[in-house]
A protein has these predicted regions:
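Conserved oxyanion/phosphate-binding beta-strand-loop segments in alpha/beta enzyme cores
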Residues: 1-36, 66-75, 99-106, 283-324, ...
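Residue patterns forming the tRNA-binding/recognition surfaces of aminoacyl-tRNA synthetases
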Residues: 2, 11, 15-19, 91-242, ...
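Helix-rich, typically C-terminal accessory recognition domains appended to large enzymatic cores
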Residues: 79, 144-160, 251, 410-439, ...
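N-terminal catalytic cores of NTP/NDP-binding nucleotidyl/phosphoryl-transfer enzymes
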Residues: 25-94, 100, 123-138, 246-247, ...
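Alpha-helical recognition segments enriched in aromatics with Gly/Pro capping
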Residues: 310-333, 362, 476-615
Length: 802
């Protein structure tokens, strides 16, 4: 009988939904398992095979854990606010609400068609009022605790999307959404003070089970550095000091100039004392046209203007040094000014060479007439540091000197900056703040949340860069919640990252209208046991969500400090040509096409069999067909089925070994080798020519997490009772996983001459005698003097002859 996957798969998907077999149960006495995958952004393109691979890993783990007796929470939802939907809506004229609803319906249908065991009663959508009410609530809590604030600053602005972007969303000088060049623009911006949590975010990494590369990326992203703040007197000012931060205070004697950011406020303050203010003004105009990426490129030509009228005084030797402005120094980084040690910094060296500035060696080891020396060495030309060869010792000694003399102090800086948290677009969570002429910024009262996104027809961004909400008088004009006076609402919306910063908490209690989640349920489900997703999200999204969670923990809203106990990641699925899939290359594989042609079980099995789960692998249609043949052969096992409620003698060891292998490999995310073990066992079964009921039950149980439809159908066809989805995982006997016989090699003078099978627990002398009786070995040593005999257990016999 042939296997009709189309009718079988639909049948079981309907049955799983009808019975609610995948519904998580709050407060169950079973051990709990919370498995989390990154909820998708429901784009118009629909799901791609990368989504299938991303979800299939924990899908397999979750199905196995259910059969092991766990109460499993494996939820799904939709991260649906953001620019892609809004840009599509503007392009097509279809309202973003309608676009979002259509896309979510399509994604849901696709996910169900693949047979994922999600709990569909807990679905969340970040654009629904009952969800973003709590996003706004958390924002107001941050505002209340001083973590949400507004400041005027230069921002990364995308002229195409007409939106302000965070540094993280504009890396490489390009908009993360449309890939246009970004520009710098002065604007009032909402920030979240994530830097206040920098140390907590770093320390928390020691307590979690993340892949080493994920921890490394997060540490690098936060970018903690230790050094010193140093005060330089500014000659020409009213006794002002220019504060800088350096990780190398031991090189202070080598400072020969300073550089300010073109936007530094000291320039405007003393404009009337600066002789070349016209040249500086022109240079500042040029800088304003450049992106942050363009300004900080290491390989670009060095530009700058010397400030005539202000100069610095080196605090350790009293020397007067020039101050320049240059575009590579940014106001948003450090203090907006740097000290320059050209002998030992490549960028400073190039700048000094171009502008004819002194270069003084303070660390021996290089030839500074040719290039900066950036290595370690003995301190020279450095007063009280001369002769010190240990960098750490020199840094400590200088830091102490700065402190003792009141000219500096030890300090810490972070590469990570406070999070720009507003967008001038329609499709996002409204920021619940009111501007009152008398009271200033006033939060919308908690009991008035959600502040609803108004339903409008014109949602296009303004040419002035203001939010579309600014045009809606009925939304903007309001009364101050504090004094009742006429007031204006904030018209910017939150970035797409807002809703995804706490979604894992809402899954725990998605229908609660009194709190974002019940505290007893939060205690029961605890932190996410296992989170899997893409490597592209291990910095921004994960750091943002860890920050939100730690804040909620600090104010007593969640009972545990870290949101995710474990984090893993899957590799990309590449196109058949080995390149990254993209529409422009025409190498995109639609999962719907695979399901329609081969079935969901084949797709599920293939994406996990195609290679190491954590690494990228190209799509191969021939391998897909191989998985189809595998599923068909599994179905055909029923044709060679015999009676029997115990493993046959011939297959007993193979079954126990496979149970162990598959069980361990699923937990280790070695899905490809787990499937390979099942394929090997299948071959063993066919070589034997028959399979009994005990063996078939075990085989389909092991395969079920990977291919649930065909295995459920076999289980039901054979009247084994119940459903595999809530069946029992199989155990193995460790003693029966050990081979009775093993294959070893026999060497003569180190060269392999024969292979033979011997008992696994044989004594050395007996193993050597058996080896010598092998015809090939006997012939090779005949007439020769045996000098030495060695048995390496389980591996080889080596005979040395002369």
């Amino acid at each position: 009988m042939g296997y009709d996957f189309k009718s079988v798969e639909k049948k079981w998907q309907d049955k799983w939904e009808e019975t609610g077999v995948f519904h998580a149960v709050d407060f169950s006495e079973k051990p709990k398992f919370y498995g989390l995958v990154e909820f998708p952004y429901p784009s118009g393109a629909g799901m791609h095979v990368g989504h299938i691979k991303a979800y299939s890993g924990l899908e397999v783990v979750s199905r196995k854990r259910r059969m092991q007796g766990y109460n499993v929470l494996f939820p799904i939802g939709f991260d649906a606010y953001g620019l892609p939907t809004e840009n599509y809506a503007i392009k097509t004229g279809i309202h973003p609400r309608k676009v979002t609803d259509m896309n979510i319906e399509r994604f849901s249908s696709q996910l169900k068609k693949v047979g994922f065991s999600f709990d569909w009663t807990r679905v969340i959508d970040t654009t629904q009022e009952d969800y973003y009410k709590w996003t706004q609530w958390i924002f107001l809590k941050m505002f209340e605790h001083g973590l949400a604030f507004r400041d005027k600053t230069l921002v990364n602005y995308c002229p195409s999307c007409k939106v302000v972007l965070s540094n993280e969303d504009s890396q490489g000088g390009k908009c993360d959404i449309c890939h246009s060049d970004i520009v710098q623009k002065s604007k009032d911006v909402w920030y979240l003070r994530i830097t206040k949590y920098a140390d907590k975010l770093l320390e928390g990494l020691d307590e979690v089970d993340y892949l080493p590369n994920i921890k490394l990326q997060q540490r690098n992203w936060i970018g903690k550095s230790t050094g010193a703040f140093v005060d330089f007197d500014v000659k020409g000012s009213d006794n002002e000091k220019l504060k800088i931060y350096t990780t190398r205070p031991d090189t202070l004697f080598g400072v020969t100039f300073m550089v300010m950011a073109p936007e530094h406020p000291m320039i405007d303050k003393y404009a009337d004392r600066i002789a070349n203010m016209d040249a500086i003004t022109e240079y500042r105009k040029e800088c304003a046209k450049k992106t942050e990426f363009e300004r900080t490129q290491l390989v670009k030509d060095k530009t700058g203007v010397k400030i005539d009228g202000l100069s610095g005084i080196n605090p350790v030797n009293g020397k007067e040094i020039p101050i320049y402005i240059s575009d590579y120094v940014m106001m948003g980084y450090g203090t907006g000014a740097i000290m320059a040690v050209p002998a030992h910094d490549t960028r400073d060296y190039e700048f000094a060479k171009k502008f004819g500035i002194d270069i003084i060696e303070v660390i021996k080891g290089g030839d500074i007439s040719k290039e900066a020396y950036t290595g370690e060495g003995e301190c020279v030309n450095s007063g009280f540091l001369d002769g010190i060869k240990n960098k750490k010792e020199a840094i400590e000694k200088m830091a102490d000197y700065l402190s003792e003399n009141g000219i500096g102090e030890k300090g810490v800086q972070y590469k990570m900056k406070d999070w720009a948290f507003n967008r001038q677009r329609y499709w996002g969570e409204p920021i619940p703040i009111v501007y009152c002429p008398h009271c200033g910024m006033v939060p919308v009262p908690y009991d008035e949340l959600p502040l609803k996104l108004p339903k409008v027809e014109n949602f296009e961004p303004g040419s002035d860069g203001e939010s579309p909400l600014a045009k809606i008088e009925s939304f903007v004009n309001c009364k101050c919640p504090k004094c009742g006076a006429d007031a204006k609402r904030e018209t910017d919306t939150m970035p797409q990252w807002a809703g995804s910063s706490w979604y894992f908490l809402r899954y725990i209690d998605p229908h609660n209208d009194k709190a974002f989640a019940d505290k007893d349920k939060l205690k029961y489900w605890g932190e996410v046991d296992w989170y899997n997703g893409g490597m592209e999200h291990v910095t921004r999204h994960m750091i943002y969500s860890r920050f939100w969670h730690k804040f909620l923990y600090d104010i007593g809203e969640v009972p545990y400090d870290e949101p995710y106990a474990k984090r893993t990641a899957q590799g990309l699925i590449l196109g058949p040509d080995g390149d990254k899939m993209s529409k422009s290359k025409g190498n995109v594989v639609d999962p719907n096409d695979v399901v329609d042609e081969y079935g969901a079980d084949v797709l599920r099995t293939y994406v996990l069999f195609m290679g190491d789960y954590e690494k990228a692998a190209p799509w191969s249609k021939s391998s897909v067909k191989g998985c189809k043949r595998f599923i068909d052969r599994v179905w055909a096992l029923q044709d060679i089925l015999t009676e029997g409620d115990e493993y046959s003698k011939e297959l007993e060891s193979a079954f126990h070994k496979t149970i162990k292998k598959v069980s361990e490999d699923i937990e280790g995310m070695k899905f490809n080798t787990a499937i390979a073990a099942l394929m090997t066992l299948l071959n063993d079964i066919y070589n034997k020519g028959s399979i009994n009921n005990a063996e078939l039950k075990t085989f389909v149980t092991l395969l079920n997490p990977f291919a649930p439809h065909v295995t459920e159908e076999i289980w039901a066809t054979q009247n084994y009772g119940g459903m595999l989805a809530n069946g029992h995982w199989v155990d193995y006997d460790e003693a029966k996983c050990v081979d009775d016989e093993i294959e070893i090699v026999t060497q003569i003078n180190g060269k392999v001459r024969a292979k033979l099978m011997i008992p696994a627990e044989i004594e050395a002398a007996e193993a050597i005698e058996l080896a010598k009786k092998d015809p090939a070995i006997a012939a090779a040593i005949e007439g020769k003097n045996v000098v030495k005999e060695l048995y390496v257990k389980g591996r080889l016999v080596n005979i040395v002859v002369k």
